[in-house]
From Swiss-Prot:
Name of the protein in its database record: Succinyl-diaminopimelate desuccinylase
Coiled coil segments of this chain: none
Obligatory cofactor(s): Zn(2+); Co(2+)
Binding positions for Zn(2+) 1 per the UniProt entry: H74, D107, E169
GO biological process annotation, one example: L-arginine biosynthetic process
Role of this protein: Catalyzes the hydrolysis of N-succinyl-L,L-diaminopimelic acid (SDAP), forming succinate and LL-2,6-diaminopimelate (DAP), an intermediate involved in the bacterial biosynthesis of lysine and meso-diaminopimelic acid, an essential component of bacterial cell walls.
Gene source species: Bartonella tribocorum (strain CIP 105476 / IBS 506)
PROSITE patterns: ARGE_DAPE_CPG2_1, ARGE_DAPE_CPG2_2
A Pfam family annotated for this UniProt entry: Peptidase_M20
The protein's assembly and partners: Homodimer.
Length: 390
């Protein structure tokens, strides 16, 4: 019989559901079973959008009044890749030599299992003077269109308001509790299309090669750093991700070149001011080249939901930091490094922090978590829940 206070049992049950985005594969059904046994009211809305898969989500709530703590996460996982590369099958949740193997062990079914077990332990000993909810999506590893962003709006329309949120993403690096995330850099992407005129390489005067202009545009974007970072954020960085002419012939001047890039930006910028800076740099190159003549460029911005943010709720950060210290003996580092997460949506509704297992093996073959790390995180979550409602 499954024991709700045992995070390993819960985690094994979740891993055995092959919930690769956007498939639910029984993961939310397992969660619903756990949570209903604990007294939660559970709903599972399905969201749709054009050109996307339908995605099932879960919202569970307990309590009627007082401070409202949200735990947020996702049950969807990335594909396991070649099964023969795994030491153990990725959806069998095998335990060997002090580790639990399986896709989603750390990203992030482990965090969900630890929080549920921690809450079950708290409820065995005392009642909570407040409200607890779990906001769990099946669309975090995919497009994130039919997941947390819509689930938050759906819950808000039902009258839900939150005091604070904890996202159980794998933020720890070497040991559980060494790092918590109190913010994230923003993310924005663009596509530069340089239009030229195709021709034979032996007759360049009859063509307009887009590559020299593309090189100048790239230099304008990358030669000067966007900034040097701030007190809470590392420097913004622009990275080229694709340079493509679609031309496989060595004797043909291509008709166009496409350059794709992504920028991770800190709190010195807004999305608007950053776009202005990029457009300014590019326009200066075009003016020097030949305005309105071949070759010329076009810039397209890709819609992004990843704005920069920083949580400044000292009480929330302090409660979590003290809970970590009470279990591990050390205070965590407060960080804003790394990629984006669904915290970028939650920050519009309440203060949010992120804290979970060490993530060294996430998205990798043989993704795994140490058994003692699972117990440590559960103990920290338990202490955090108790202290949050004091």
């Amino acid at each position: 019989m499954l024991v709700l206070t045992d995070p390993l049992q819960l985690l094994q049950a979740l891993i055995r559901c092959p919930s690769v985005t956007p498939h639910e594969a029984g993961a939310l059904s397992a969660l619903e079973q756990f949570l209903k046994k604990m007294g939660f009211h559970v709903e599972r809305p399905i969201f749709t959008d054009k050109n996307t898969d339908n995605v099932e989500n879960l919202y569970a709530k307990m309590g009627n009044e007082g401070p409202h703590l949200m735990f947020a996460g996702h049950t969807d996982v990335v594909p396991p890749g070649a099964l023969e590369d795994w030491t153990y099958p990725p959806f069998e949740a095998v335990i060997d030599q002090g580790k639990l193997y399986g896709r989603g062990a750390v990203d992030m079914k482990g965090g969900i299992a630890c929080f549920i077990a921690a809450l079950a332990r708290v409820l065995e000993k005392r009642s909570i003077k407040g409200r607890v909810s779990l906001l769990i999506t099946g669309d975090e590893e995919g497009t994130a269109i039919n997941g947390t962003v819509k689930l938050l709006k759906w819950a808000e329309k039902k009258g839900e308001k939150w005091t604070a949120a904890l996202v159980g993403e794998p933020t720890s690096v070497k040991t559980v509790g060494d790092i918590i995330k109190i913010g994230r850099r923003g993310s924005i992407s663009g596509i530069i299309t340089v239009k030229g005129r195709q021709g034979h390489v032996a007759f360049p005067e009859r063509a307009a090669n887009p590559l020299p202009l593309a090189s100048k545009l790239i230099q304008a974007l990358t030669q000067i750093a966007l900034d040097q970072g701030t007190e809470n954020f590392q420097p913004s960085n622009l990275e080229l991700t694709t340079i493509d002419t679609g031309n496989l012939a060595v004797n043909v001047i291509p008709a166009q070149t496409t350059v794709r890039f992504n920028i991770r930006y800190n709190d010195l910028w807004t999305k608007e001011t950053l776009m202005e800076e990029i457009e300014k740099r590019l326009s200066l190159v075009q003016e020097k080249n030949n305005s309105g003549q071949y070759p010329f460029y076009q810039l397209e911005w890709i819609p992004s939901l990843g704005d920069v943010f920083l949580t400044k709720n000292d009480k929330l950060i302090q409660v979590l930091s003290n809970a970590i210290k009470s279990v591990t003996g050390s205070l965590p580092e407060c960080s804003t490094s790394g990629g984006t997460s669904d915290a970028r949506f939650i920050k519009d509704y309440c203060p949010v922090v992120e804290f979970g297992l060490p993530g060294q093996t996430m998205h990798m073959v043989d993704e795994c978590v140490a058994l003692d790390a699972v117990e440590t995180l559960t103990a920290i979550y338990e202490r955090f829940i108790i202290d949050f409602f004091v």
